[in-house]
């Protein structure tokens, strides 16, 4: 059996997965929080993310490992079939968050971070406790920062409050 450590950041910083390949070629990935089973995504609606771009890259890395016989995520059931489908579902959930934020800003012109967090939570039907608020707030901030870094959003400080708006695209 061969053991490999694979950097899988995104959900958290410096996350690693462990790939075990047996002598007969069977592959098991201990993925940690780099991938969520379908039921977990449905349960939380908004997967906690520290770095959206890295999260997508980590999902691509998992996809590039080839056929996995077992994928052991940090939460939920083991994934024994349709790993590629599960990867796509994870990506779709991330794209849905991005799309939600962009649509909110198209409709509202500009929003403060806190109002954005509230609106995203309402759209994804999340009933927030204090703990849940912290997780959702961090995730929404991650997406806002990534969209800003990618030239899609801009931020302005108005009366000591951060406001987000779509960056005007040159035609």
Name what the model sees in each region.
Residues 2-98:
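Metallo-beta-lactamase
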Residues 103-171:
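C-terminal regulatory/interaction regions
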């Amino acid at each position: 059996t061969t053991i490999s450590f694979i950097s899988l950041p995104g959900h958290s910083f410096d996350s690693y997965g462990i790939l075990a390949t047996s002598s007969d070629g069977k592959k098991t990935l201990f993925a940690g929080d780099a991938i969520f089973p379908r039921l977990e995504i449905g349960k939380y609606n908004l997967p906690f993310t520290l770095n959206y771009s890295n999260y997508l890259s980590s999902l691509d890395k998992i996809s590039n490992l080839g056929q996995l016989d077992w994928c052991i995520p940090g939460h939920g059931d083991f994934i024994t079939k349709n790993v590629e489908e599960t990867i796509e579902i994870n990506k779709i959930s991330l794209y849905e968050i991005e799309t939600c934020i962009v649509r909110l800003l198209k409709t509202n012109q500009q929003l403060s971070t806190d109002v954005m967090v509230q609106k995203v939570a309402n759209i994804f039907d999340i009933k927030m406790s204090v703990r849940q608020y912290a997780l959702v707030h961090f995730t929404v901030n991650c997406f806002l920062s990534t969209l800003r870094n990618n030239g899609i959003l801009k931020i302005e400080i108005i009366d000591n409050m951060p406001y987000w708006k779509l960056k005007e695209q040159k035609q």
